[in-house]
Amino acid sequence: GYHRAAGEPHAEIECLADARAKGIDPRGATMAVTLEPCNHHGKTPPCSEALIEAGIARVVFGLRDPNPLAAGGLERLRQAGIDVTGPVLEQECRDLIADFLVWQTEQRPYVILKLASTLDGRISTRNRQRQQISNAASHHNVHLLRAGIGHCGGAVLIGGGTFRADNPALTARTVPTDRQPLACILTSRLPQPTADFQLLRDRPQDTIFFVSPAACASTVAHALGEKGVRVFSVGPGINGRPDFPALFKLLRQDLGCPYILCEGGGK
């Protein structure tokens, strides 16, 4: 069993349902879980109570739940007489649910870097002309990744240079998807609303610009907003560079974005 989406049954509930659907009585069984079973009423009932009611005899867990609101499941299981073993394979479990741990402990999106480079570390020719480095299989994998991120409500992030030089669509095109990722551009210069960019023409409602406070208050930003494009202010951080922690916080907490796929250039 696995947790398919927020608000859906957790992995433990899915596992119990799968066993019963196959005619297997879980009573007296051992259940191995990556994360401590939750112990609170949120979008779903507590998994700890479901395991107790199912008659599970032993639970082997990998990690304690970092969310204090959901923690406490292990103690509840022990109180009910269930044998609890763990933590086990902690690093492997951390790697398996690295995105979830980032959401819970840092309240930001999980950031993925997409990078194609030559063996000597180059990403373009000497005169900065575009040169294909990746093969067809790599291109297909990028579209798979975009499709998955889009399905979850995630975003692709690029800089203004990539936006202006490549005029990208930032969509999943070679694989079926029910939802395209958001297109986020971090730039010092907003485009004119009438400029012929794919994102402005075809996907204005999915396009978000992150700019300085002054640019965010400009007439260009207002005109883009009338087209459905969103423009947000991101102030300077360390050494005058964009404040990425603030950007990530905005994406996660205000826009609900769980993943960011970074596809920008060298800068």
PLM feature spans:
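Active-site ligand-binding patch in enzyme domains
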Residues: 102, 108, 112-258
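Short Gly/Pro-enriched loop/turn and capping motifs at secondary-structure junctions
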Residues: 191, 266-267
